Every structure is written in C-alpha cells, then in structure tokens.
Amino acid sequence: MKKIRLELVYLRAIICAIIIVTHLLTQITLKHENMEGGSLVLQFYIRNIVIFGTPCFIILSQLLTTLNYQKVTYRYLTTRVKYILIPYILMGLFYSYSESLLTDTSFQKQFIENVLLGQWYGYFIVVIMQFFILSYIIFKINYNLFNSKILLLLSFILQQSFLYYFTNNTAFHDTVLHYYPLSENTIIFGWIFYFFLGAYMGYNYERVLNFLERYLVIMIVLAVATYFVFIALANGDYWNVTSFSYSLTPYNSIMFIVILGICTHFKTMLFNTIQMISAFSFFIYLLHPIILDSLFAYTNIFEDNTMVFLAISLLFILGLCIGVGMILREFYIFRFIIGKQPYKLNINAY
C-alpha cells in the first residue's frame, strides 16, 4: 500500500488554488483594458508573484511518478490516456460547444483551435501528456537517469536557451512556429527543466524533505531574490503575463520547493476540505475557466477590496467545481470526466 504523504495532498490543493487566483487576477486586468502607468505595472508584478501554478503542476506530476514507480508497464500510458487525455477531450468538447454558441462560430473551428491545437487554458494537459511519454521512455532506458544531475543541468540550459531565443529572436520565434503546428505554450522545450526537476525530487524525496527541514528559510530568501531577478529582467510589456518565460524559471522552481517545505508542517488543518480540493484538482483545473466569466460578473463588485474579492471568488469557484464533481462522482462512468482521484476519497455513507 502506498504511503499517504499529507504534504503532497496539501501541495496539490494549494497549487490548484494558486492557479485559480492567477486567473482571477487576469480577469481584473482584462476588465480594465485601458489601465496604464503605475496601476498596470503593479498589476503585472502582483500577477507574476502567483504565476508559478502551471510549472508547479508539471513538477508535481513528475515528482509523483518517480516517487511511486521504479518501473512502468504499458498500462502506465493507457491509464493516463483514460483518466487525463479523455477528460481533456470531453471537457474540451463542452468548452468548444459553449464557445461556438457564445461567439457565433463553428463548433469544428473551436474544437480544432482550442482542443487539438491547444489554444486554450487546457494546453497544460497537452504538455503533461508529452511528459508522460518521455517519462515512459526514460523508465524503459534506465530509471536511474531521473537521478542524473547532469541531465538536470542540461535540461535547465535547454529550457532557458529555448525560451530566451524564442522571446528575443524574431527569426528563431517565427521558424519554430512555422514548423510546430500546436500552440506555442505546448512546446516541450519550454517546460523540460520542470519535468527533470520533478523527477529528481521524486527520486530523492526523503533527502529533499530533510533538506527543507533544515534550510526552508534559506529557500524562502532565494525565492524573494529570484523574483527580484525577474523584475530586473522585465522587458516593459506589462500586459503579457506568462509562466512560459526564461526570467521566471528560477522563481517558479524555488517556489515549488518553498511551498512543499511549508506543506510539511501541515497535518490536520482544514484537512477534509484540502482533501477534496486535492482529489478534484484536475477537474477544477478544467472546469473553473468555463464558469469564471459568469462568476466574475458578480464577484467583481468586491474588486476594490482585493483580498475579499479573491476569498469570495475562490470560495465560490471551489464550491461549484467540487459540488458538480461530487454529483458526477456518484456515477462511475464520469471517471472519464473528473478523473480517478475523486473515487479514492474516503467519504462516509449515510
């Protein structure tokens, strides 16, 4: 029986909440499309503080893989197709249909652009599926490659080089997009370091926990320092906020380590709620952007008090997504929409 690691339950829930907060802050910026000057700059830096959600999910996904497996079979891939790729496609069908009605465009156009090409918020799943295949290949070659510091360093150099030239070299950018058919956010080279970082941490998990027990404060200081490095490298485009950026790689990576370290100190705090958020996190990730606009139409009345706005919006989004998920969970067929994790919840029957 696999050991239940409470810190990872808390970690998954917190990352899920961080992604929602990121999208809520984006909604505020989009509402004020004429924002400029100091207000725009402040919004830019606040949004980037919490932009690490998607990279953290990539790191966590691979950490869990190398932590829980030392060898894999073909079933490793088929399970992820059933419970990750199929839900992505089914939710994408629903999203494409709703968007076709909203924008008065064809369903086929919406489905191809969004789901197949990855030009929607669900692009993250396209990235994750590529890493599942890469992980399977590495397992078949040699599991111990996940412990390679050389591979970790090379992946960092590759990711940073790719993102730097993709951002700053127009010819390189245009060439890549000419030959790569999907959304630019799904290019594996822009996320490859997070994959190997998660793999390395999963392989050395107990050592990582021991390190954090002693040096968590130092990692927090490093997180602050790397964010100031990002500020120093900012190029003046205060509308574009993305984790697909070379200047944020150190910050995103260290923030994952920091949050993991903080989560090791949580044992029972709000555990039932945290457990539900963690179990439904994949479904929340796919569903919440669909309802975000409608919910924002109400909660933006609290915008002048940012903390109240975020708290109420977060409460409603999590409540709605988990509520829908709990109903779907009653029918086993919906595992192809909500994934398999919700069915592992230990909920008392009355």
Curated annotation (Swiss-Prot):
It is a multi-pass membrane protein. It comes from the Bacteria. Signal peptide: none annotated. It is found in: Cell membrane. The chain crosses the membrane at residues 7-29, 44-66, 79-101, 116-138, 145-167, 187-204, 211-233, 243-262, 269-291, 306-328. Keywords: Cell membrane, Membrane, Transmembrane, Transmembrane helix, Transport. InterPro entries: Acyl_transf_3_dom (IPR002656). One of its GO terms (cellular component) is plasma membrane. GO terms for molecular function: O-acetyltransferase activity. Its main location: membrane. Presumably involved in the export of the biofilm adhesin polysaccharide poly-beta-1,6-N-acetyl-D-glucosamine (PNAG, also referred to as PIA) across the cell membrane. Belongs to the acyltransferase 3 family. This is Probable poly-beta-1,6-N-acetyl-D-glucosamine export protein. It comes from Staphylococcus aureus (strain MRSA252). The lineage of its organism: Bacteria, Bacillati, Bacillota, Bacilli, Bacillales.
